[in-house]
UniProtKB/Swiss-Prot annotation:
Protein name: Light-harvesting protein B800/830/1020 alpha-1 chain
Reported function: Antenna complexes are light-harvesting systems, which transfer the excitation energy to the reaction centers.
Main location: membrane
Keyword hit for Magnesium: yes
Amino acid sequence: MWRIWKVFDPRRILIATAIWLIIIALTIHVILMTTERFNWLEGAPAAEYYSS
């Protein structure tokens, strides 16, 4: 396993992983915010949604 770090720079791998996780998190949040059911800022409370 230690040989892989001779090929890849650990700093670049960690930075790339962090950027990738931020992009995925923002994408998931944007998708959820565009739906009526999961938009917690403009949507109705959960009780109102499930009662209709």
